[in-house]
Regions:
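N-terminal substrate-binding region of glycoside hydrolase catalytic domains
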Residues: 2-121, 241-293
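Short, flexible/disordered intra-domain loops and linkers
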Residues: 52-54, 160-172
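An active-site-proximal structural segment forming one wall of the substrate-binding cleft
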Residues: 65-71, 100-150, 176-183
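Aromatic-lined carbohydrate-recognition surfaces of secreted/lumenal glycan-active proteins
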Residues: 145-156, 177-205
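Substrate-binding cleft of secreted/luminal carbohydrate-active enzymes
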Residues: 198-202, 209-312
Length: 432
């Protein structure tokens, strides 16, 4: 078998739609129709989390939503902790014991629905919230299971908005709102945090943002306007801060609006929907996701969520102690990959056993859409040199293969699919 001293290969883009790690659809955690989505969405009420003061229902919650199974499958969570979800019946979303200690919120029956809006400025409420949030974070852990945390806690649906024009106790002032946000920042150091609006805190702390009116042009344009120019919130004309380039460092999430039909968003006005997604640089949508029965729209939306990584070129050169490898990696998606997960090259034998692993000096969070990075490493040893055996026409006879993978630290498995036309095996993409 002959050996050459150099080898170059290029790879075409795979333009198909597919789920991928940390991006795409985030259906409800207890749905039976999640398909192959890599994310799940958990809306957790305080009432469910802490039924008695200081007594947390973590074991029941973990079992109810199958957390152990999700972790094993490599599925990650989007979580929103909420205190007020408008419904069809009068109800409480905070625990009875907490209501008994406060009672200074507002029972309501509005066009949003029925429920109870707490007084979030209440000192007892704030102290109890601090405790439950840290307990929740400790329960969920720091293994990366929770990828995204949407703030959460304040307002109807946790969206930091109260229908105070209907006489409800209004949102607290910025100082108190910032206390809530600071608790989230401290409690969830390994997750990406997202706020509903570009508050000053979000801009200063480089947080992400989410849009729960995705697909609705007027509301999304207003949301994008806040991001571009800042604006009013309540009585403060400067509470919303311009942060037009935030998506380069922090993610965009949200869900489809309930004000439009799937037929409208995924068929009739699909181009409009896709345009709104693209200019928003979204990474995930949930829990209201596209319906799979609208296959064209479902896939078109999925394809526009998040990063799309491709090795565009590989160059191998024989060197004294092995093979030098130079790769050009491009991001052809709408957003960066926000986690610094290890990107590895692997030399494998024909049975798929890993003979050599080398981490690439590739910074995924810095790889912006439309950009590429060129990285070089040395694959040491005779096994790597055998990658240059044969010739392009005789590659099938080469005793070694070169693969690339991006490892999810939660599972220690390769989890990211590259958007390129190449064979895949065990979560890795085959380069040679």
């Amino acid at each position: 078998m002959s050996a050459s001293t150099t080898k170059t290969r290029t790879y075409a883009a795979d333009d198909s739609a597919f789920p991928n790690a940390q991006i795409g659809y985030a259906p409800l955690v207890d749905t039976t129709e999640a398909g192959d989505a890599t994310l799940r969405y958990l809306e957790l009420t305080w009432r469910e989390a802490e039924p008695e003061e200081g007594v947390y229902a973590w074991e029941a919650i973990s079992e109810k939503y199958g957390f152990a199974s999700l972790r094993e499958q490599g599925i990650h969570l989007v979580i929103r902790f909420v205190c007020d979800v408008p419904g069809q019946e009068t109800h409480l979303d905070i625990p009875d014991w907490l209501y008994a200690q406060t009672k200074d919120g507002s029972w309501y029956d509005t066009d949003y629905g029925k429920g109870y809006s707490p007084n979030y400025a209440n000192v007892v409420f704030r102290a109890a919230h601090h405790r439950v949030l840290y307990a929740l974070a400790e329960f969920l852990g720091t293994d990366g299971f929770v990828s995204y945390v949407e703030l959460g806690s304040l307002g109807h649906w946790g969206e930091w908005h109260i229908k105070s024009e209907d006489g409800l106790v209004p949102m607290p002032d910025e100082t108190i709102r910032d206390e809530y946000a600071a608790d989230y920042l401290a409690a969830f150091p390994t997750a990406e945090l997202l706020m509903r609006r570009p508050f000053r805190f979000a801009a200063e702390q480089s947080l992400g943002l989410y849009n729960d009116m995705t697909g609705e042009e007027k509301d999304t344009d207003e949301w994008l306007g806040w991001i571009a120019e800042g604006g009013w919130y309540g009585s403060d004309p400067n509470a919303l801060t311009p942060m037009p380039d935030f998506w380069q460092n922090a993610p965009v999430g949200g869900e489809f609006t309930s004000s439009l039909s799937m037929q409208d968003m995924l068929v009739k006005n699909l181009p409009r929907t896709l345009h709104l997604l693209e200019i928003s640089h979204m990474s995930f949508l949930g829990p209201k996701t596209a319906q799979v029965k609208y296959a064209k729209g479902y896939n078109a939306v999925l394809r526009r969520l998040g990063y799309r990584l491709r090795v565009t070129e590989l160059k191998l050169n024989l060197c004294t102690d092995g093979v030098s490898a130079e790769l050009t990696v491009a991001n052809e998606g709408a957003a960066p990959f926000y986690w610094d997960w290890p990107t590895n090259l692997y030399v494998e034998d024909t049975a798929g056993s890993t003979l050599c692993t080398v981490r690439l000096p590739l910074s995924l969070p810095e790889l912006m859409p439309g950009k590429s990075q060129k990285v070089s490493v040395t694959l040491e040893g005779a096994d790597a040199q055998e990658l240059l055996c044969g010739g392009w026409k005789g590659l099938f006879r080469s005793p070694k293969h070169l693969t690339i993978g991006i490892v999810d630290p939660m599972t220690s498995r390769d989890a990211v699919r590259f958007a390129m036309k190449a064979a895949r095996k065990n979560g890795r993409t085959v380069l040679l």
